[in-house]
Amino acid sequence: MLKIKLEKTTFENAKAECGLVFIVNKDFSHAWVKNKELLETFKYEGEGVFLDQENKILYVGVKEDDVHLLRESACLAVRTLKKLAFKSVKVGVYTCGAHSKDNALLENLKALFLGLKLGLYEYDTFKSNKKESVLKEAIVALELHKPCEKTCTNSLEKSAKEALKYAEIMTESLNIVRDLVNTPPMIGTPVYMAEVAQKVAKENHLEIHVHDEKFLEEKKMNAFLAVNKASLGVNPPRLIHLVYKPKKAKKKIALVGKGLTYDCGGLSLKPADYMVTMKADKGGGSAVIGLLNALAKLGVEAEVHGIIGATENMIGPAAYKPDDILISKEGKSIEVRNTDAEGRLVLADCLSYAQDLNPDVIVDFATLTGACVVGLGEFTSAIMGHNEELKNLFETSGLESGELLAKLPFNRHLKKLIESKIADVCNISSSRYGGAITAGLFLNEFIRDEFKDKWLHIDIAGPAYVEKEWDVNSFGASGAGVRACTAFVEELLKKA
């Protein structure tokens, strides 16, 4: 992992094998830009990367004066430096966007540091010829870019230390999620997921309760149990409950995650091509584990409960079937018409369990629907719920964190599509349209009236796992939901 070292020196005087200079909005007037004639000769116009071998400076373009593009460019920089086999790099302090805000410097330092640290991630556990990065150190010269001196009132050193702490915690938390989601299903079972949660709990002095199928039976969590029936005796289910309790808590927050460690679709079997990447169906539960790590280390003033429903959805003699009717923990009956709509069954019981804790806010995370990916693309998560203020807060704070989010509206016409003639609700819509929303409306059936305005549903099916590099994410798992929800909790507590 890349170590970031803060030094009270100028960029020119800092010692490293290579310098890193960002060209913001194609502006070459910065004092750190050397040998402009060379750049002109090679027609480098401030896009992509360019290595000045004579001065040992890597130039990286930042398309616009924007904090998110700075983060992405920092990530591109370390990936390039890794390929070039430099052992150390030095960089100065930049401010991109929002120059009128007092926290502009802090936010840009967070973006810079996070981009630098996330860029080197690669899931290579099973590669026999691992290529470990020789890039080990980034020196940050605490020299303030002159235009900032009039607009940023925060102390530079204080901001740098705060930003570095954030970047280190967020990188660790995201990598916990990435590693867990990327873990293949032969290893990443419900029991394994619980073991990862126990490690996080031990390191952060959290309470943890890991419940088996007997507990689920006692609590009448029959929808959850049904999904696991084909795996029971081989890979039994686990209800994982993590608890972070600070001395002073302004809010009680329940975070609920879908933890499908593998999903073949059950008897409503997926086509072979659609099964590939279904190890990532534990993205929501993994995000909750990462969030507990982040929120505990950041020391947020909220009591946070992380609830993960971990199970497989497989085929076998005991598998639950289309036409089954399940009685959920909430007491509502569910007509099963498609066993591949299983995540919502697990979440229904887990949300019921979460409501028993009487939280002030409930947020669930799930790789719930392919329809969400069709509607929003593979880089954007969906936000659903009843409370407009809460949805807006999650969207704005999440977007500021660097994640892409969009609100999807509930409506009475789509609600009719999950009605059942023989049970209280059907687990699948009667229409092929609006599938992301109808899945959210299904979950809504299990939210009690007193919690309707306290609940948000986040569908992370798109960005949780993408088979290519994008933004600050490597091939595979991204840790979707962690940055957004951390920012949401912090903003929520400011209003408490």
Swiss-Prot record:
PROSITE patterns: CYTOSOL_AP. Binds 2 manganese ions per subunit. Its cofactor is Mn(2+). It catalyses: Release of an N-terminal amino acid, Xaa-|-Yaa-, in which Xaa is preferably Leu, but may be other amino acids including Pro although not Arg or Lys, and Yaa may be Pro. Amino acid amides and methyl esters are also readily hydrolyzed, but rates on arylamides are exceedingly low; Release of an N-terminal amino acid, preferentially leucine, but not glutamic or aspartic acids. GO terms for molecular function: manganese ion binding; metalloaminopeptidase activity. It is found in: Cytoplasm. The keyword Protease applies. GO terms for cellular component: cytoplasm. Its EC number is 3.4.11.1, 3.4.11.10. It comes from the Bacteria. One of its GO terms (biological process) is proteolysis. Its main location: cytoplasm. Disulfide bonds: none annotated. Keywords: Aminopeptidase, Cytoplasm, Hydrolase, Manganese, Metal-binding, Protease. The active site is at K270, R344. Mn(2+) 1 binds at D263, D340, E342. Mn(2+) 2 binds at K258, D263, D281, E342. InterPro entries: Leucine_aapep/pepB, Macro_dom-like, Peptidase_M17_C, Peptidase_M17_leu_NH2_pept, Peptidase_M17_N. Pfam families: Peptidase_M17, Peptidase_M17_N. PANTHER family: CYTOSOL AMINOPEPTIDASE, LEUCINE AMINOPEPTIDASE-RELATED. Belongs to the peptidase M17 family. Presumably involved in the processing and regular turnover of intracellular proteins. Catalyzes the removal of unsubstituted N-terminal amino acids from various peptides. This is Probable cytosol aminopeptidase. It comes from Helicobacter pylori (strain HPAG1). The lineage of its organism: Bacteria, Pseudomonadati, Campylobacterota, Epsilonproteobacteria, Campylobacterales.
